[in-house]
From Swiss-Prot:
Organism: Streptococcus pneumoniae (strain Taiwan19F-14)
The protein's name: 2,3,4,5-tetrahydropyridine-2,6-dicarboxylate N-acetyltransferase
Pathway field: Amino-acid biosynthesis; L-lysine biosynthesis via DAP pathway; LL-2,6-diaminopimelate from (S)-tetrahydrodipicolinate (acetylase route): step 1/3
EC identifiers of the protein: 2.3.1.89
Domain of life where this protein originates: Bacteria
PROSITE patterns hit by this protein: HEXAPEP_TRANSFERASES (PS00101)
Tagged with keyword Transferase: yes
Assigned protein family: Belongs to the transferase hexapeptide repeat family. DapH subfamily.
Function according to Swiss-Prot or TrEMBL: Catalyzes the transfer of an acetyl group from acetyl-CoA to tetrahydrodipicolinate.
Keyword flag Transferase: yes
Biological process terms in GO annotation: diaminopimelate biosynthetic process; lysine biosynthetic process via diaminopimelate
Catalysed reaction, written as an equation: (S)-2,3,4,5-tetrahydrodipicolinate + acetyl-CoA + H2O = L-2-acetamido-6-oxoheptanedioate + CoA
Keywords (A to Z) from UniProt: Acyltransferase, Amino-acid biosynthesis, Diaminopimelate biosynthesis, Lysine biosynthesis, Repeat, Transferase
GO MF entry, a single one: tetrahydrodipicolinate N-acetyltransferase activity
Lineage of origin: Bacteria, Bacillati, Bacillota, Bacilli, Lactobacillales
Length: 232
């Protein structure tokens, strides 16, 4: 399913109105004394559900009261994205929240964190450990390097998100500050901190980032993407 594009106010309302859940997986021994409610899934001696629904069942265990609880969140408002219908390569360990849009043949590497409302264009790679904050937008056939940060904006509502154009390369550990726009075809050097908009087809570097040259044939050759990595 493709997420519906949401503005900041809609995201805030989505989070505020969402049922807060502490999802758990519980493996238990013994017999349950009470019927399992519809909100809990029971497969053999394993329970899946919200802790508030599962906990009363464990209090009524008969014969043996041993159980193990696995959980990864507390009162979470935003579930993780259901990735089954996404036509992209998503590696283990990537954390992608609900209401994220991912284009065809995109690549999301291990450890990437993508927050609610972010958009990733077709053929774009988000490398290991990169962070896309809330509502950050990356165009088509771009590359966000390992450890790079595209700052998110959900509050204040009036703030603008980061927008990255098509065919952009953002180097490892670069940081793009809230509201900054990166023009299509540009390159952000590794470690740069981008505090102002970047026009199309230039290279920026430094802290704060400044234009050091326009894109030339040599730069295009060095920063060319590999289509083979995006083959499904």
């Amino acid at each position: 399913m493709t997420a519906t594009k949401m503005n900041a106010q809609e995201i805030i309302q989505f989070i505020a109105n969402a049922e807060k859940k502490t999802s758990v997986k519980v493996t238990f021994e013994g017999q349950l004394a009470t019927a399992v409610p519809s909100s809990v899934v029971k497969l053999g001696n394993v329970l899946f559900g919200d802790w508030k629904d599962v906990a009363p069942l464990l209090e009524g265990l008969v014969e043996n009261q041993d159980y193990v609880v696995e959980q990864d969140a507390r009162n979470s408002a935003v579930p993780l994205l259901d990735k089954r219908a996404i036509n992209a390569r998503i590696e283990p360990g990537a954390i992608i929240r609900d209401q994220v849009k991912i284009g065809d043949n995109a690549v999301i590497m291990m450890g990437a964190v993508i927050n609610i409302g972010a958009e990733i264009g077709a053929g774009t790679m988000i490398d290991m450990g990169a962070i896309l904050g809330g509502r950050a937008i990356v165009g088509k056939n771009s590359h966000v390097g390992a450890g790079a940060v595209l700052a998110g904006v959900i509050e204040p509502v009036s703030a603008e998100p980061v927008r990255v154009g098509d065919n952009v390369l953002i180097g490892a550990n670069a940081v793009v500050i809230e509201g900054v726009q990166i023009g299509s075809g540009s390159v952000v050097a590794a470690g740069a901190i981008v505090t102002q908009d970047v026009p199309e087809n230039v290279v920026v570097a430094g802290v704060p980032a400044r234009i050091i040259k326009e894109i030339d044939a040599q730069t295009q050759q060095k920063t060319a993407l590999e289509d083979a990595l995006r083959t499904l």
